[in-house]
């Protein structure tokens, strides 16, 4: 019996050797190729996990690289730290979402796509619209969490839709790539799902730089803002206890036909916090007050020496000016009435709005976000790091108007809205003729502080004067009627308070006003009416009717339904507003932290503040400093009308509002 020989080492005795054995070198090459493929797949997987944060950093540099490179060391380190936070957050979500099986993985994948689309799409669209990222400032005042999540942006605008859809497609693509290239090994596959809740918690709790510098990647700023508005709605925080501006939904304005008394353009120049008594309202050859530049430029203007705002709060005041509607109207009315731009556009006018105001303040952007304009800029367009209170430099908005003025098509209606006279004020020692001046709010330094304010008005007026000088030298400027006023005034302890929004005393509501019209832009009867208005008591509620008359729309049948809500009268016509006029800093457009309101009829003014349980009565012509209270009965029937209009005295705590002992604070 033959015994089979022993098989060579490494070969099975029952398997016949291949007639074409694989060379050892070929086997080694296959293994190396396989290892290279695995390394490349791992590198590709790592790149996919890093891609969301790389997208954030890259697009951020494309939008504002110069500003990022200018960060000082602490802010640069803060930015880098937030980049690491972003990297961990997106990597954890995408790592878990890369698994092809399991309900948890599918849920995290959906969450990743949702958060990626919102953070990248909404922030990209918001920056394209406002030159700044959406932050807590632009979200916390929203009364709707869903709208705050999408930045209350106008999705009818192609630029908004493009950013959001682009982010969705990119996020979906990253999920596909993750499931192809990210192959978690056993332990990472078990551990990363446990990190998801910690990652989500971290991005809503770790502080961010969300104002001015925004030295945090925008995805982290976005999640911080969403968390802030959610906590506000849940009552965990009270950063926005009072109602602020919400998005308007204006009624449709029918097509109208403009029939102005003379062919003309109309321009409103709106100042901020400027008192009447620091302004040369009449032309004065040797003006000693703060508005020397505009005074010298327009000697033939029609002064309005007794013009008063109906509020000393900007948001309420601009509503009064631009809508003509009483500030005491219902909330739905205040958010649905058209504004001057809506009427002008319905009549075929070109329209513009330029402002140095930072409209991130108190949701103010929502009031003008949807106005129909061909030219528009806000503070963050001019300077993305503009101050929330003082805005961008008034000089910058004048530059923008000068740059774009020639692009407007006549006839047009435009508004230039300044900002730097708002506290804490924009001051330049090189342009400060009022001395001694000191930024010191202590009582013993009150006059120096007021001089500081005068110098601020002087500097801002320089920017206004430069803009108007340019406009008057253009062909279109020679056909443009200019109306000038301020949203409200500013108090300096005349009645124990500083600033504005705190009362309806004259230091806060008596404002400068004038109309300047080149030859041939007004009819003789319009000139006569404006000349007669010099010393007559007129109101901001008269300005919207005045603009509509200048635009040739006041008598249009299409305007009649909207005129029913307007109580004012055109200053270009002889009829004046003689009925009682509401004055208030508390409305359904903008609630007040310090309650105050009143009424006026002719020279008689009724006012009350947070601590008052009865009204005070003054005659502002006989007693311009409002030092002698005449008693409620001297203003009859205004006290009864005020109680009917405002329902309670300011010292009554409204239901649902925490009681505050104002006598001790």
Predicted segments, located by residue:
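Active-site-proximal alpha/beta segments of enzymes that process anionic O-linked groups
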Residues: 200-268, 273-440, 551, 568
């Amino acid at each position: 019996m033959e015994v089979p020989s022993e098989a060579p080492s490494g070969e099975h005795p029952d398997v016949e050797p291949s007639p074409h054995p694989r060379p050892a070198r070929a086997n080694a090459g296959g293994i190396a190729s396989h290892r290279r493929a695995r390394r490349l797949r791992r590198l590709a997987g790592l790149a996919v996990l890093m891609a969301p944060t790389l997208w954030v950093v890259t697009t951020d540099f494309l939008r504002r690289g110069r500003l990022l490179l200018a960060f000082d060391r602490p802010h640069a380190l803060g930015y880098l730290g937030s980049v690491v936070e972003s990297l961990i957050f997106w990597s954890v979500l995408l790592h878990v979402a890369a698994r092809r099986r399991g309900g948890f993985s599918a849920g995290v994948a959906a969450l990743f796509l949702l958060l990626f689309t919102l953070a990248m799409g909404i922030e990209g669209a918001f920056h394209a619209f406002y030159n700044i990222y959406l932050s807590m400032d632009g979200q916390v005042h929203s009364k709707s969490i869903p709208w705050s999540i999408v930045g209350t942006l106008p999705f009818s605008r192609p630029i908004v839709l493009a950013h959001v859809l682009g982010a969705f497609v990119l996020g979906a693509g990253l999920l596909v790539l993750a499931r192809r290239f990210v192959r978690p090994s056993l332990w990472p596959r078990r551990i990363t799902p446990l990190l998801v809740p910690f990652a989500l918690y971290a991005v809503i709790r770790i502080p961010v730089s969300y104002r001015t510098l925004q030295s945090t990647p925008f995805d982290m700023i976005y999640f911080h803002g969403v968390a802030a508005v959610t906590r506000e709605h849940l009552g965990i925080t009270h950063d926005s206890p009072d109602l602020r501006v919400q998005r308007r939904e204006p009624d449709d304005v029918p097509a109208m036909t403009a029939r102005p008394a003379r062919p003309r353009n109309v321009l409103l120049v709106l100042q901020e916090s400027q008192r009447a008594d620091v302004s040369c309202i009449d032309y004065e050859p040797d003006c000693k007050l703060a508005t020397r530049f505009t005074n010298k430029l327009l000697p033939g203007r029609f002064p309005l020496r007794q013009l008063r705002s109906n509020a000393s709060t900007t948001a309420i005041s601009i509503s009064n000016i631009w809508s003509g509607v009483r500030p005491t109207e219902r909330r739905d009315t205040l958010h649905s009435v058209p504004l001057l731009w809506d009427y002008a556009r319905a009549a075929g006018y070109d329209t513009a709005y330029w402002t140095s105001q930072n409209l991130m303040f108190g949701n103010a952007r929502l009031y003008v976000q949807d106005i129909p304009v061909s030219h528009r800029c806000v503070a963050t367009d001019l300077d993305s790091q503009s101050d929330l209170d003082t805005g961008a430099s008034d000089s910058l908005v004048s530059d923008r108007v000068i740059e774009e003025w020639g692009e407007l098509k006549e006839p047009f209606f435009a508004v230039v809205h300044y900002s730097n006279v708002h506290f804490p004020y924009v001051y330049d020692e090189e342009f400060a003729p009022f001395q001694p001046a000191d930024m010191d709010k202590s009582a013993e330094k009150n006059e120096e502080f007021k001089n500081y304010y005068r110098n601020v008005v002087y500097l801002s007026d320089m920017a206004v004067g430069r803009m108007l000088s340019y406009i008057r030298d253009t062909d279109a400027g020679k056909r443009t009627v200019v109306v000038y006023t301020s949203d409200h005034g500013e108090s300096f302890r005349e009645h124990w308070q500083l600033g504005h929004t705190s009362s309806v005393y004259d230091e806060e509501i008596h404002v400068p006003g004038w109309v300047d019209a080149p030859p041939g832009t007004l009819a003789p009867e319009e000139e006569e009416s404006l000349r007669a208005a010099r010393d007559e008591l007129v109101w901001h509620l008269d300005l919207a009717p005045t603009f509509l008359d200048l635009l040739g729309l006041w008598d249009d049948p299409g305007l009649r339904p909207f005129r029913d809500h307007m109580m004012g009268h055109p200053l270009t016509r002889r009829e004046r507003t003689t009925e009682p006029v509401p004055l208030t800093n508390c409305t359904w457009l903008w609630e007040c932290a310090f309650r105050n309101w009143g009424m006026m009829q002719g020279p008689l003014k009724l006012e009350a503040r947070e601590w008052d349980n009865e009204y005070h009565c003054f005659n502002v012509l006989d007693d311009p400093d409002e030092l002698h209270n005449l008693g409620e009965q001297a203003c009859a029937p205004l006290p009864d009308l005020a109680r009917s209009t405002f329902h309670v005295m300011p010292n009554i705590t409204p239901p649902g509002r925490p009681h505050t002992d104002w006598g001790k604070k």
